[in-house]
UniProtKB/Swiss-Prot annotation:
A Gene Ontology biological process term: chemotaxis
Function: Methylation of the membrane-bound methyl-accepting chemotaxis proteins (MCP) to form gamma-glutamyl methyl ester residues in MCP.
Protein name: Chemotaxis protein methyltransferase
GO MF annotation terms: protein methyltransferase activity; protein-glutamate O-methyltransferase activity
Swiss-Prot/TrEMBL keywords: Chemotaxis, Methyltransferase, S-adenosyl-L-methionine, Transferase
Native source species: Escherichia coli (strain K12)
Enzymatic reactions: L-glutamyl-[protein] + S-adenosyl-L-methionine = [protein]-L-glutamate 5-O-methyl ester + S-adenosyl-L-homocysteine
One GO cellular component, as annotated: methyl accepting chemotaxis protein complex
Limits of the CheR-type methyltransferase domain: 15-286
Length: 286
């Protein structure tokens, strides 16, 4: 016995599985638009990634042509689809205590500072970085009110929602000590077995907000004792990198620290930052 789908369902299924054409001209337009909106440089070898991510947007909107999608974007500069476009093309690779050598340096720096110690996580992604910063500061400075604060931002609003929730799979916490896991997380039970959630006592010290590093103004509560901007500059060209670093300067306190990613080098881009350690820069006191 055989059965067949109704004609309309068959057409929809074909639409969902058929590979759409991404022309050179469309790829160039996509590259120009994401550069203008987010500063991200898309090399030619990213073409398949761009297709795989954006085709989901086309299909969710019932579109079968990249040209129609781009026309939809460009016809309304304030459309909510712009945020979905940006969210689709940002890369979010992160982990708790990634580049672990940074956190002892942060702790040592925090011990030697007076007043409220403030940190900005400028590419917070799904929250692992700002919560790692928060755990480090809680272990180092305690949790007395007004002792420290973390501000966390990202251009991708979807990952910020996950960050705010503070919910992770247990295996994502493999870099934490048993003491940190017990002190700062609650284990899920029943239908939430295998999940953990950041305890509210820690989450209260972390504020999340969307922020585009290309924005004309940074709505951040600076100045900060330290800024983490790790593994994001690699997606920008040198002109954009220099502009962002220039704008970081007034947002850092004298002798404040800037933490970079393992493949990033800022020494030649902004003379006011001097290398303090492995991918760690200090703002000159001058």
């Amino acid at each position: 016995m055989t059965s067949s789908l109704p004609c309309g369902q068959t057409s929809l299924l074909l639409q969902m599985t058929e590979r759409l054409a991404l022309s050179d001209a469309h790829f160039r337009r996509i590259s120009q638009l994401i550069y203008q909106r987010a500063g991200i440089v898309l090399a030619d070898h990213k073409r398949d990634m761009v297709y795989n991510r954006l085709v989901r947007r086309l299909r969710s909107l019932g579109l079968t042509d990249f040209g129609h999608y781009l026309n939809l974007l460009e016809s309304n500069q304030h459309s909510g689809e712009w945020q979905a476009f940006i969210n689709s093309l940002t890369t979010n690779l992160t982990a708790f205590f990634r580049e672990a050598h940074h956190f002892p340096l942060l702790a040592d720096h925090a011990r030697r500072r007076s007043g409220e110690y403030r940190v900005w996580s400028a590419a917070a992604s799904t929250g692992e970085e700002p919560y790692s910063i928060a755990m480090t500061l809680a272990d180092t400075l305690g949790t007395a009110p007004g002792r420290w604060k973390v501000f966390a931002s990202d251009i991708d609003t979807e990952v910020l929602e996950k960050a705010r929730s503070g919910i992770y799979r247990h295996e994502e916490l493999k870099n934490l000590t048993p003491q940190q896991l017990q002190r700062y997380f609650m284990r899920g039970t029943g239908p939430h077995e295998g999940l953990v959630r950041v305890r509210q006592e820690l989450a209260n010290y972390v504020d999340f907000a969307p922020l585009n590093l290309l924005a004309k103004q940074y709505t951040v509560p600076g100045p900060f004792d330290a800024i983490f901007c790790r593994n994001v500059m690699i997606y920008f060209d040198q002109t954009t990198q220099q502009e962002i670093l220039r704008r970081f300067v007034p947002l850092l306190k004298p002798d404040g620290l800037l933490f970079a990613g393992h493949s990033e080098n800022f020494s030649h881009l902004e003379r006011r930052f001097t290398l303090r350690g492995q991918t760690v820069y200090a703002l000159s006191k001058d």
